[in-house]
UniProtKB/Swiss-Prot annotation:
<comment type="subunit">
    <text>Interacts with ATG8 family proteins (via AIM motifs), and ubiquitin (via CUE domain). Found in a complex with TOM1; interacts (via N-terminus) with TOM1 (via GAT domain); the interactions leads to TOM1-recruitment to endosomes and inhibition of TOLLIP binding to PtdIns(3)P.</text>
</comment>
<feature type="short sequence motif" description="AIM2">
    <location>
        <begin position="151"/>
        <end position="154"/>
    </location>
</feature>
<dbReference type="GO" id="GO:0006954">
    <property type="term" value="P:inflammatory response"/>
</dbReference>
<protein>
    <recommendedName>
        <fullName>Toll-interacting protein</fullName>
    </recommendedName>
</protein>
<comment type="function">
    <text>Component of the signaling pathway of IL-1 and Toll-like receptors. Inhibits cell activation by microbial products. Connects the ubiquitin pathway to autophagy by functioning as a ubiquitin-ATG8 family adapter and thus mediating autophagic clearance of ubiquitin conjugates. The TOLLIP-dependent selective autophagy pathway plays an important role in clearance of cytotoxic polyQ proteins aggregates. In a complex with TOM1, recruits ubiquitin-conjugated proteins onto early endosomes. Binds to phosphatidylinositol 3-phosphate (PtdIns(3)P).</text>
</comment>
<dbReference type="GO" id="GO:0016310">
    <property type="term" value="P:phosphorylation"/>
</dbReference>
<keyword id="KW-0967">Endosome</keyword>
<dbReference type="GO" id="GO:0005769">
    <property type="term" value="C:early endosome"/>
</dbReference>
<dbReference type="Pfam" id="PF02845">
    <property type="entry name" value="CUE"/>
</dbReference>
<dbReference type="GO" id="GO:0006511">
    <property type="term" value="P:ubiquitin-dependent protein catabolic process"/>
</dbReference>
<dbReference type="GO" id="GO:0043130">
    <property type="term" value="F:ubiquitin binding"/>
</dbReference>
<dbReference type="Pfam" id="PF00168">
    <property type="entry name" value="C2"/>
</dbReference>
<dbReference type="InterPro" id="IPR037301">
    <property type="entry name" value="Tollip_C2"/>
</dbReference>
<keyword id="KW-0395">Inflammatory response</keyword>
<dbReference type="GO" id="GO:0031624">
    <property type="term" value="F:ubiquitin conjugating enzyme binding"/>
</dbReference>
<feature type="short sequence motif" description="AIM1">
    <location>
        <begin position="133"/>
        <end position="136"/>
    </location>
</feature>
<keyword id="KW-0391">Immunity</keyword>
Length: 275
């Protein structure tokens, strides 16, 4: 029971302090901002959705129907799979025949069987202009270990399937049950002024109110599958065997087969037969 005693300066309150003493209760808006930030970070790494596997997409090149604008276009690709967005580097002066040879590693959430690909022309003094797009269904054969090398039709202003074609090489690696990619422990900076802060790694803008102390997000330790390294000797040997295939395409196939050289040769033979 609390008691009071008298001193020269007045009465002093003695006893147990309440648990919420000097604590600022966050408003509903502040709590929602914090929950949104955590959800965005989980979605960035597929933590809340789980992962059924990893899709490797090699964006090789495109043959476009038209060069939009007065100068040669600087195209780049944007891939949307689930909640994640990936981009290739810009093919400067690529015009109608840009080449990227960019390998994109995508985590595939459960229930996702396709992805959306867009090609943009990078502009210096205005918004980037979308040139073409396509909707790609992930082939069922990928889950059986095969590699798909296909040309996909592009659509936009010229009409459906009339904007040219894009060459994609895809492979799929199954992820064992219970394994998923998650971010490391992230400690948010303490902000005491109204403003906009950026969450490390995820890069999601979040507003903090005065007195609000953001909380860290501890992540459960997970075990990630390790792939066999792709040696330069194996890569060079397969490149000599398949001189018509791009070096990055061969590297992607070796990584998809987890360093198994015989399986990679079978996949590459299948690709050359389809060409």
């Amino acid at each position: 029971m609390a008691t009071t005693i008298s001193t020269q300066r007045g009465q002093v309150y003695i006893g147990e302090l309440p648990q919420d003493f000097l604590r600022i209760t966050p408003t509903q808006q502040q709590q929602q901002v914090q929950l949104d930030a955590q959800a965005a970070q989980q979605l960035q790494y597929g933590g809340s959705l789980g992962t059924v596997g990893r899709l490797s997409i090699t964006v090789v090149q495109a043959k476009l129907a038209k060069n939009y604008g007065m100068t040669r276009m600087d195209p780049y690709c944007r891939v949307r799979l689930g909640y994640a967005v990936y981009e290739t580097p810009t093919a400067h002066n690529g015009a109608k025949n840009p080449r990227w040879n960019k390998v994109i590693q995508c985590t595939v959430p459960p229930g996702v069987g396709s992805f959306y690909l867009e090609i943009f022309d990078e502009r210096a003094f205005s918004m980037d202009d979308r040139i073409a797009w396509t909707h790609v269904t992930i082939p069922e054969g990928l889950r059986e270990g095969s590699v798909v090398d296909e040309w996909y039709s592009l659509s936009d202003r010229q009409g459906d399937d009339k904007e040219g074609m894009i060459n994609l090489v895809m492979s799929f690696a199954n992820m064992p049950a219970g394994m998923h990619m998650s971010p490391p422990v992230v400690l948010m900076p303490t902000v005491y002024q109204q403003g906009v802060g950026y969450i490390p790694i995820a890069g999601v803008p979040t507003a903090y109110s005065p007195g609000m102390v953001p909380m860290g997000m501890p992540a459960a330790p997970t075990v990630t599958p390790q792939e066999a390294p792709c040696s330069e000797e194996d890569l060079k040997a397969l490149q000599d065997m398949f001189p018509n295939l791009d070096r990055e395409v061969i590297r992607t196939v070796i990584e998809a087969q987890q360093g198994n050289k015989d399986a990679a040769i079978n996949s590459l033979l299948q690709m050359t037969e389809e060409l």
